């Protein structure tokens, strides 16, 4: 004859209630947003443009998989505030959206319904091995040679207004350097300058003055645009 041991129903319910309460307590843990931004290193050197593209891809696709769009929008705004070192604004956004941070970081957070949201670290801070890109007109020009090795001459530059300007040039000068020099003389911003060089066919050098054929001149000469880092072929440029 066998026997069994029973457990009072009330005690079982109390035990389940305590376990459920402990679980809700752990899930409801919330800490203030930490001020320290995460430090991380990319697997490969990443440019600023690549980082922006990676972030845009995440923010465009994340709401399509899980969570509510308004929470994603709040997290995006908070992430921008964190990167801008505006900790108070980021905390206000998190609190206003009722977002819970169990570890005080946006890498893991929950909304009011208990839905989990995770932000990759690259959305919160750039990598330590980020490569900064420079625009066409920004950045540092190449170091100039020592004055005793720099051979200068005067270069005539004709503006679109027809005015001729004389600049001090050398064989190693770049267009970026000459643009800055023209800006100092005429006040024309480098970003508004467009430089062109005029080439002529070699047989024109042997023509006597007044013997030029206008039709042939149009066929044997042309203008070529110059970029910021172009070094002039001064043998074809007009020297004074």
Curated annotation (Swiss-Prot):
It holds the Pfam family ubiquitin. Residues 1-48 are annotated as: Disordered. Residues 12-22 have a biased composition (Low complexity). Gene3D superfamilies: Phosphatidylinositol 3-kinase Catalytic Subunit, Chain A, domain 1, Ub domain-containing protein, DC-UbP/UBTD2, N-terminal domain. It comes from the Eukaryota. Residues 28-42 have a biased composition (Basic and acidic residues). InterPro entries: DC-UbP/UBTD2_N (IPR032752), DC-UbP/UBTD2_N_sf (IPR038169), Ubiquitin-like_dom (IPR000626), Ubiquitin-like_domsf (IPR029071), UBTD1/2 (IPR039869). May be involved in the regulation of cellular senescence through a positive feedback loop with TP53. This is Ubiquitin domain-containing protein 1. The lineage of its organism: Eukaryota, Metazoa, Chordata, Craniata, Vertebrata.
């Amino acid at each position: 004859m066998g026997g069994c041991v029973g457990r009072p129903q009330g005690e079982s319910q109390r035990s389940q209630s305590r376990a459920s309460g402990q679980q809700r307590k752990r899930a409801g843990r919330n800490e203030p947003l930490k001020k320290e931004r995460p430090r991380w290193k990319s697997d490969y050197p990443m440019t600023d443009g690549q980082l922006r593209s990676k972030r845009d891809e995440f923010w465009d696709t994340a709401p399509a998989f899980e969570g509510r769009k308004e929470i994603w929008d709040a997290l995006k705004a908070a992430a921008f505030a964190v990167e801008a070192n505006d900790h108070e604004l980021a905390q206000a956004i998190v609190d206003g959206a009722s977002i819970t941070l169990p570890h005080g970081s946006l890498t893991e957070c929950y909304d009011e319904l208990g839905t989990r949201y995770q932000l990759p670290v690259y959305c919160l801070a750039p990598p330590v091995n980020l490569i900064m890109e420079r625009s066409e007109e920004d950045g540092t020009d190449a170091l100039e040679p020592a004055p005793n090795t720099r051979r200068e001459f005067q270069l005539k530059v004709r503006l679109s207004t027809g005015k001729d300007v004389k600049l001090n040039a050398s064989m190693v000068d770049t267009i970026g350097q000459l643009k800055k020099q023209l800006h100092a003389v005429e006040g024309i911003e480098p970003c508004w300058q467009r430089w062109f060089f005029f080439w002529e066919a070699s047989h024109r050098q042997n023509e006597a003055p007044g013997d030029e054929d206008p039709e042939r001149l149009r066929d044997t000469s042309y203008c070529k645009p110059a970029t910021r880092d172009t070094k002039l072929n001064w043998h074809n440029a007009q020297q004074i």
